[in-house]
Amino acid sequence: MLAARLVCLRTLPSRVFHPAFTKASPVVKNSITKNQWLLTPSREYATKTRIGIRRGRTGQELKEAALEPSMEKIFKIDQMGRWFVAGGAAVGLGALCYYGLGLSNEIGAIEKAVIWPQYVKDRIHSTYMYLAGSIGLTALSAIAISRTPVLMNFMMRGSWVTIGVTFAAMVGAGMLVRSIPYDQSPGPKHLAWLLHSGVMGAVVAPLTILGGPLLIRAAWYTAGIVGGLSTVAMCAPSEKFLNMGAPLGVGLGLVFVSSLGSMFLPPTTVAGATLYSVAMYGGLVLFSMFLLYDTQKVIKRAEVSPMYGVQKYDPINSMLSIYMDTLNIFMRVATMLATGGNRKK
């Protein structure tokens, strides 16, 4: 499941930002290309209209319709995706009000925090401290790579070599940091943690082409989303979202396939724009739900892990899922802000 999240994270900049310089984005209206499509007559449908032939579409026609550039259809697909995100935001806001105001009859984690032992509070505190540290190190790594032309050019290529190398680095760094025990080898564990954050910074580095002001806005929006959803997870019943594992796995598979499929289809086609919207907007809602799930999972793990057990509580491993959710949300919010701004021009 973690590998699928990495693919969803890695394919986003390679598919959205790099091709933006070579071909139109599905939501950025290129006036020259648009006028060319609008002014070029479709001989096939014009001929069929003149001779009055009415018959069902064949498989070839359906394929051509899916791969045909149509800015009007692409715009509608993008709008549907944005409305889907807006609906998810409304549901999240309603859940925040419902659980935050104490309207639920069940006891949430925030009520249980009063009777938590001190070691449970320390575990959760250290987990979120490492999360904040990972985000800060990732930002510093992204800035450093953006100011290194050789590394930045490599990350911006979007070739299969670049994707393969970065994906291998992400998986390798993730496996390394998870495999080292926190209590027995604190030094190597923290070095692996630094390496993992640096590698993820390289993945985020292509976002710097969007500019500092937009990324700061995206960071604030992401902080609001993460803070609001974390509050919902804390106020909701302690196992309310832990039962969403199977549906979230299905949704992750759908976003995973859409992310891979969007790499092979041009974003200016109906099929490519549909896959892009599923990976972008569906992914934003999906990883927001994952954040609810992972937050309650961290709390549950901090509560049930024995203090003197054989396997000690690992705050670094515990925060990795929330960290990946946060990065996926941030990259999609930044992309939505960028494409939304370009669409208004």
From Swiss-Prot:
Catalytic reaction(s) noted: Ca(2+)(in) + 2 H(+)(out) = Ca(2+)(out) + 2 H(+)(in); K(+)(in) + H(+)(out) = K(+)(out) + H(+)(in)
Residue ranges spanning the membrane: these are: 83-103, 126-146, 160-180, 191-211, 214-234, 245-265, 272-292
Post-translation changes: Undergoes AFG3L2-mediated proteolytic degradation, upon hyperpolarization of mitochondria.
Q: Name one GO biological process term.
A: mitochondrial calcium ion transmembrane transport
Q: Entry's InterPro entries?
A: Bax_inhibitor_1-related (IPR006214), GHITM (IPR035871)
This protein's source sits in the domain of life called Eukaryota
KW Cytoplasm (keyword) present: no
Establish whether keyword Cell division is in the entry: no
Q: Which GO terms describe its molecular function?
A: calcium channel activity; calcium:proton antiporter activity
Where in the cell is the protein located?
Mitochondrion inner membrane
**What is the membrane topology here?**
Multi-pass membrane protein
Question: Which residues are the transit peptide here?
Answer: 1-45
**Main location as per UniProt:** mitochondrion
- Mitochondrial intermembrane topological domain: 104-125, 181-190, 235-244, 293-345
What keywords were assigned to this record? Apoptosis, Membrane, Mitochondrion, Mitochondrion inner membrane, Transit peptide, Transmembrane, Transmembrane helix
Q: Which GO terms describe its cellular component?
A: endoplasmic reticulum membrane; extracellular exosome; mitochondrial inner membrane; mitochondrial membrane; mitochondrion
Query: What task does this protein carry out?
Result: Plays an important role in maintenance of mitochondrial morphology and in mediating either calcium or potassium/proton antiport. Mediates proton-dependent calcium efflux from mitochondrion. Also functions as an electroneutral mitochondrial proton/potassium exchanger. Required for the mitochondrial tubular network and cristae organization. Involved in apoptotic release of cytochrome c. Inhibits the proteolytic activity of AFG3L2, stimulating respiration and stabilizing respiratory enzymes in actively respiring mitochondria.
Instruction: Tell me its family.
Output: Belongs to the BI1 family.
Question: Partners and quaternary state?
Answer: Interacts with LETM1. Interacts with AFG3L2.
What protein name applies here? Answer: Growth hormone-inducible transmembrane protein
Task: State the species of origin.
Answer: Homo sapiens (Human)
Task: Tell me the lineage of the source organism.
Answer: Eukaryota, Metazoa, Chordata, Craniata, Vertebrata
Q: Give the gene that encodes this protein.
A: GHITM
